[in-house]
Curated annotation (Swiss-Prot):
Organism of derivation: Synechococcus elongatus (strain ATCC 33912 / PCC 7942 / FACHB-805) (Anacystis nidulans R2)
NCBIfam families: argS (TIGR00456)
SMART domains (UniProt xref): Arg_tRNA_synt_N, DALR_1
InterPro entries linked to this entry: aa-tRNA-synth_I_CS (IPR001412), Arg-tRNA-ligase (IPR001278), Arg-tRNA-synth_N (IPR005148), Arg-tRNA-synth_N_sf (IPR036695), ArgRS_core (IPR035684), DALR_anticod-bd (IPR008909), Rossmann-like_a/b/a_fold (IPR014729), tRNAsynth_Ia_anticodon-bd (IPR009080)
Identification of the protein by name: Arginine--tRNA ligase
Subunit: Monomer.
Group of enzyme by EC: ligase
Pfam family, one: DALR_1
Keyword Protein biosynthesis among UniProt keywords: yes
Motif 'HIGH' region in this chain: 126-136
Keyword terms of this UniProt record: Aminoacyl-tRNA synthetase, ATP-binding, Cytoplasm, Ligase, Nucleotide-binding, Protein biosynthesis
Subcellular location: Cytoplasm
Amino acid sequence: MAAPLAQLRDRFQAALAASFGPEWAATDPLLVPATNPKFGDYQSNVAMSLAKQLGQPPRAIAETLVQNLNLADLCEPPAIAGPGFINFTLQPSYLVAQLQQLQTDERLGIQPVSPPQRVIVDFSSPNIAKEMHVGHLRSTIIGDSIARVLEFQGHEVLRLNHVGDWGTQFGMLIAFLQEQYPQALSQPDALDISDLVAFYKQAKARFDEDPSFQETARQRVVDLQSGEATARQAWQLLCDQSRREFQKIYDRLDIQLEERGESFYNPYLPAIVEDLRRLGLLVEDQGAQCVFLEGFQNKEGQPLPLIVQKSDGGYNYATTDLAALRYRLGQDQAQRIIYVTDSGQANHFAQVFQVAQRAGWLPAAAQIEHVPFGLVQGEDGKKLKTRAGDTVRLRDLLDEAVDRARTDLTTRIAAEERSETPEFIEAVAQAVGLGAVKYADLSQNRNSNYIFSFDKMLALQGNTAPYLLYAYVRIQGIARKGGIDFAQLDPVAAVLTEPTERSLAKQVLQLGEVLDEVARDLLPNRLCSYLFELSQTFNQFYDRCPILNAEEPQRTSRLLLCDLTARTLKLGLSLLGISVLERM
């Protein structure tokens, strides 16, 4: 079942072809939801945009289009306003018919795409021997939500975790541990991940000031790269330990990922450099092999190259990213690749993509996209830090969110003189705390920095996860109070006599349009905005329309609207990685 906007767009494009010739059939009709209910449900200003090309007044163009629009089953007769705006109001009979289809459709009328794409979403990507911090939060949950939406649409999605599991830092850490704490390199879990981080800092300080230790560390890198057994075993232990810690976070956040770290691409790196050399793209600059690109300059205005092989013959992130991109397009047969990282890497990926383009590695139809995001800031507007000035550990942040949600809940239970089991309290605290953290991030435009505030994200009012969860809980409460099993309600024609009934019905039908936007523009905040507006509209409907005490057929019709709203909220929140609750 196509969403209203999609159906309207198809009819509009047919009218464009009928009005001005088949060459205009692919013209974007510029349809958007109406800014004010008095203008109907949707508006188009395509007549203004075509005036110059067609050499006609916008209003004349609008009149011609309206004459050729076949909308009798979908809309009231379109109205032309002002210089040539075309306003559309959906027919009540159309809304009723669409709602009836949704009642028995588990996917709420959203058909899988055809044909589906093979999509890779590269997200999270923490570094071995380092703890996940608040900076990993955004990549992890933005990437997960994008993957969930694309999967629901029917695309074949490969979720990749490009873990930082290779590099000279391992030689430094292994050398230090062999000297200071050798059992860490032979016994699993001899150290906690936080101990590893502390040892890494000590190793780095030692490396910076001790030339003999520098030499030892470099030798460990050579050992590791050559496959020497002791070095490889030590590296594997460090990776396994970090991986287990990462998985605890992923399990807690319900994140599915397939790890394919930097080391996976090591065998492919020499061919990257050789192929770029063969293609005549490499230039030697101060001993390093580089590709100079258009549009990239340093602060002094000099050309800024992408280095693909260092002067000592070693490789770097750019080499690995080029190898990964070529592997994903070749062996994985990806048609769309999405990289979810902080905005500070935007130039790096722009350079990598341009090199791949110049090398001829990008198929014409391939979509390669960098999805950047801004910083998480404290309430002082600066990068979020602990009081000691350290980076906030992700596990500590999640713990605090759950603790605060638990405190809020127990306070509310006491005020309401309710009695709840410890299991109930814990389940609600986990769902609300973790859901609040996810939603607070996803509800922001990812391109912006945002201020992290526990108080705001856990509030029961406003654009928050608790507000949306409470709307769902309120609907389940209606069912419990009335002894209603929504699944057993007989499908009936909705009765949309009240304005809030119509508004709610129309919003329920818009989920497919919103998901299309999210999949196209990779902006999960649009789904958040939709769910927030749906919750607001439901609460207005709840306040103004009796439900359990209404006469038939309004009673059943309103119960069905409640059920469709709850199902839409549940589905939408699941695509954000947030679980609903029956009570809270």
